[in-house]
Curated annotation (Swiss-Prot):
NCBIfam families: moaC (TIGR00581), PRK12343.1 (NF008999). GO terms for biological process: Mo-molybdopterin cofactor biosynthetic process. The gene is moaC. Homohexamer; trimer of dimers. Belongs to the MoaC family. Substrate binds at L74, C75, H76, M110, E111. Transmembrane segments: none annotated. This is Probable cyclic pyranopterin monophosphate synthase.
């Protein structure tokens, strides 16, 4: 059975990282939102009524990375060195990729994952009126495949 460092019996605790050495850390995460092709086209051409979808999602991802310890209770507050947010698209999807670097005692995976999640949620929020069907449902829209694709320590 794997060892869970955040659990001690029936108690939940923040892991003590004070004895760890400080090294450069990097994590890259990605995730995808599936949309109607007309919606992706509107994002590409900048004709979404709420404004520039990807610029807004980039800002939201950056803010989310910096707020991760307030959202995930056992995450350490760590100094963030850099945040990069990139988007790629297909005819029916947009993939967000967030890279976070730090120089510290613990990794930045949760920060990268949080950034990706909030970027994708922001995209959904900005285009939801175009994604709903006549019943107010989202038959096409979905967020998937959020994962860490690279991690470097040292």
């Amino acid at each position: 059975m794997p060892e869970f460092t955040h659990i001690n019996g029936d108690k939940v605790q923040m892991v003590d990282i004070t004895a760890k050495g400080e090294v450069k850390r990097m994590a890259r995460a990605e995730g995808t939102i599936t949309l109607r092709s007309d919606t992706v086209a509107a994002i590409r051409t900048g004709t979404v009524l709420k404004g520039n979808v990807l610029a807004t999602a980039r800002i939201a991802a950056t803010l989310a990375v910096k707020q991760t310890p307030q959202l995930i209770p056992l995450c350490h507050q760590i100094p963030i060195g850099a945040i990069t947010v990139d988007f790629t698209d297909t005819e029916v999807s947009i993939t967000a990729e967030v890279t976070v670097t730090s120089y510290g005692r613990t990794g930045v995976e949760m920060e990268a994952l949080t950034g990706v999640s909030v970027a994708l949620l922001t995209i959904w929020d900005m285009v939801k009126s175009a994604e709903k069907d006549e019943n107010g449902q989202y038959p096409v829209t979905g967020i998937s495949d959020i994962r860490v694709i690279e991690k470097i320590k040292g």
